[in-house]
């Protein structure tokens, strides 16, 4: 008879098999009422799951981290049930859980409208309020195919037909609706209290553009209404901060169909870009990097040697001329090895730190393109360090110091670190992997960094550290990477002469901090809602005249600011000062310097911030000092 070990270490002995619900009720009726699911020996299951033998058990309530997956999966079924109730001719396909929510794809003769979504949501609340029991049963594969064909659900029958014949399938029923699903699900629809349908979009059947178009309804679901409201607020804020909208409103960049996924930088946007590049270049010099430049078009022979042609070919832009095949580089690593290989290297030359603002192209699917966040042409702050195995720890420690310093200057202090460890299929001996993984851990410990291990998620050629930023809405953006590579140097015949005179292969460390300039700019724009820190703002101050009598003085103020390194402009238009202030505030210019007759007479400016704060009057020297000091401080405000 089963012994059940609970999270607190307590072991409960039972005389007969029993369900997770029964165990919860044995502990307390309140726990049984709150139980959503269970985790038996690490596997997530329904509360109706029958425990027949000894196991460890976690009872999942809405407070447990597993609860949202179960709630969202069940809400996807609730959505499908509501759609079938309102639109019986609609056919169901799949409805998985995604980040922060779920979706369900339907085949229907017409497009769902916003009014339809409202009706569907009302019906979902009605079904949830009915507190319908959710039950599970199993069917053999062939019976399941015939069952769904009998319901007119051809798509579901096709899905089942792809499953091996000897498999038994699970179906979940709630009321008069039944769907194919592995589960688990909540015990009844009454557990689904906080959800919202967010949008409808097109989606190809099985993700293939040659197949018919389906309709995908997206939604979100949470354990309670407070969490739902907080999420919807974040969603609303994210919509306001959308870098594509702000990019247009602030005249930073645009995209066109003539160059999908490639940015047309406007003067203001290019100013930000150049500031990023200038900043990174200076930081890299401080840390001993040598900047290089490698070709855009490279013969396929290099990509074949590096392994990219076999594994990355579909994502490369290729061309042919004079009977030779070339690829536009999707990454800079193989080219950096060519520079390393140019000339004999000794152990005394290591570590060798090479950096490039690598202009790369990748043939991303058109449907995946998303403003600056997903592009086909990107510039990466790419660097590769060639070193010995014994130098890995010290080099990684130096990289982490640089990463933390750079992110701080951009105003990001909450950094999450993840250590991707060896996968089953890998190159290199266990001893080498032990050494590399230990070096990465010790480097992080030396910087007082806390991290999460990700077993099995390293690349086949080495472990890596992933550095992710948390923005003002709590969204996580993976930007930085520190990757150990045991493979590419050997594939491309990189070597050095060791102290004992032997020929050795160096370790290659791939390193990016921003990731791509384009994506990082998108993150910055959304994080700051367009109100970039002073040092990054394309226009840092604008001088506003009250009348044309101050034009000459305004020009003098602007020139003085520019000589002190401030990006300044002026507005001499014959418009009311209130109109000018509003217009430049909407353009999110950090400082508005108003000049009238009194300011001209006293050689001063009246200073306002873009947030409407009146800083009073200042002399020209004072405002210059104020702005230049803030620019120097960067994110340390």
UniProtKB/Swiss-Prot annotation:
Binding residues annotated for Zn(2+), in chain numbering: 333, 384, 510
Keyword match Cell membrane: no
InterPro entries: aa-tRNA-synt_IIb (IPR002314), aa-tRNA-synth_II (IPR006195), aa-tRNA-synth_II/BPL/LPL (IPR045864), Anticodon-bd (IPR004154), Anticodon-bd_dom_sf (IPR036621), Beta-grasp_dom_sf (IPR012675), TGS (IPR004095), TGS-like (IPR012676)
Keywords, ordered alphabetically: Aminoacyl-tRNA synthetase, ATP-binding, Cytoplasm, Ligase, Metal-binding, Nucleotide-binding, Protein biosynthesis, RNA-binding, tRNA-binding, Zinc
Cofactor: Zn(2+)
CC cofactor note: Binds 1 zinc ion per subunit.
Superkingdom of the organism of origin: Bacteria
PROSITE patterns, sorted: AA_TRNA_LIGASE_II (PS50862), TGS (PS51880)
Region annotation (Catalytic) ranges: 242-533
Location(s) in or outside the cell: Cytoplasm
Documented EC number(s): 6.1.1.3
Catalytic activity: tRNA(Thr) + L-threonine + ATP = L-threonyl-tRNA(Thr) + AMP + diphosphate + H(+)
Location (main, coarse): cytoplasm
A single BP term in Gene Ontology: threonyl-tRNA aminoacylation
GO annotation, cellular component aspect: cytoplasm
Residues annotated as domain TGS: 1-61
GO MF annotation list: ATP binding; metal ion binding; threonine-tRNA ligase activity; tRNA binding
Subunit structure: Homodimer.
Cited NCBIfam families: thrS
Function: Catalyzes the attachment of threonine to tRNA(Thr) in a two-step reaction: L-threonine is first activated by ATP to form Thr-AMP and then transferred to the acceptor end of tRNA(Thr). Also edits incorrectly charged L-seryl-tRNA(Thr).
Family statement drawn from the similarity comment of this UniProt entry: Belongs to the class-II aminoacyl-tRNA synthetase family.
Protein name, entry field: Threonine--tRNA ligase
Organism encoding this protein: Legionella pneumophila (strain Lens)
